């Protein structure tokens, strides 16, 4: 019987899983932001129709796009998300103790909740704005 599979979100702690997300990444060779280097910096590739080079840190959820071939992924990550705890980890993920891993994952979960809460707040504010405009038009 084989080892049980890791939960999908925990798989992203492993660099090879992050590399696998860079299927149609535009920068493959002779550049600083190859899939391997992007994955080392904690990024996964999550392209959209309008942003084919969109990458997101799986840990702090910072999204960056508009990559240039000479962009250094770790430097860009530090510049745009200096508080990301993933960047401070000095060990390979496989070398972390269970306690270290769970502490790290607790921070990732907090980041995810903060991101989702922020997105919901923006969505609510946009709905409130639209509703307010509709009410004002009725009153006019």
UniProtKB/Swiss-Prot annotation:
It is found in: Cytoplasm; Nucleus; Chromosome; Chromosome, Centromere. Ubiquitinated by the Cul9-RING ubiquitin-protein ligase complex, leading to its degradation. Ubiquitination is required for centrosomal targeting. Deubiquitinated by USP35 or USP38; leading to stabilization. Acetylation at Lys-129 results in its homodimerization, while deacetylation promotes the formation of monomers which heterodimerize with XPO1/CRM1 which facilitates its nuclear export. The acetylated form represses STAT3 transactivation. The dynamic equilibrium between its acetylation and deacetylation at Lys-129 determines its interaction with XPO1/CRM1, its subsequent subcellular localization, and its ability to inhibit STAT3 transactivation. PANTHER family: BACULOVIRAL IAP REPEAT-CONTAINING PROTEIN 5 (PTHR46771:SF3), DETERIN (PTHR46771). Keywords: Acetylation, Apoptosis, Cell cycle, Cell division, Centromere, Chromosome, Chromosome partition, Cytoplasm, Cytoskeleton, Kinetochore, Metal-binding, Microtubule, Mitosis, Nucleus, Phosphoprotein, Protease inhibitor, Repressor, Thiol protease inhibitor, Transcription, Transcription regulation, Ubl conjugation, Zinc. GO terms for biological process: apoptotic process; cell division; establishment of chromosome localization; G2/M transition of mitotic cell cycle; meiosis I; microtubule cytoskeleton organization; mitotic cell cycle; mitotic cytokinesis. Residues 113-129 have a biased composition (Basic and acidic residues). Zn(2+) 2 binds at residues 76, 80. The modification N6-acetyllysine is found at residues 23, 90, 110, 112, 115, 129. Residues 113-140 are annotated as: Disordered. It comes from Mus musculus (Mouse). Multitasking protein that has dual roles in promoting cell proliferation and preventing apoptosis. Component of a chromosome passage protein complex (CPC) which is essential for chromosome alignment and segregation during mitosis and cytokinesis. Acts as an important regulator of the localization of this complex; directs CPC movement to different locations from the inner centromere during prometaphase to midbody during cytokinesis and participates in the organization of the center spindle by associating with polymerized microtubules. The modification Phosphothreonine is found at residues 34, 48, 117. This is Baculoviral IAP repeat-containing protein 5. The gene is Birc5. Zn(2+) 1 binds at residues 57, 60, 77, 84. One of its GO terms (molecular function) is protein homodimerization activity. Its main location: cytoplasm. The BIR repeat is necessary and sufficient for LAMTOR5 binding.
């Amino acid at each position: 019987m084989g080892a049980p599979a890791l939960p999908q979100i925990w798989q992203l702690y492993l660099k090879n899983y992050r590399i696998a997300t860079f299927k149609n990444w535009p920068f493959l060779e002779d550049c600083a932001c190859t899939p391997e280097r992007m994955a080392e910096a904690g990024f996964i590739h999550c392209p959209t129709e309008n942003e084919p080079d969109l990458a997101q840190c799986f840990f702090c959820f910072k999204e960056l796009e508009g990559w240039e071939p000479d962009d250094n992924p770790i430097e860009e990550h530090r510049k745009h998300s200096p508080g990301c705890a993933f960047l401070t980890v000095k060990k390979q993920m496989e070398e972390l103790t269970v306690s270290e891993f769970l502490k790290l994952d607790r921070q990732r979960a907090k980041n995810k909740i903060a991101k989702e809460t922020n997105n919901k707040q923006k969505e609510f504010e946009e709905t409130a704005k639209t509703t307010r405009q509709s009410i004002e038009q009725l009153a006019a």
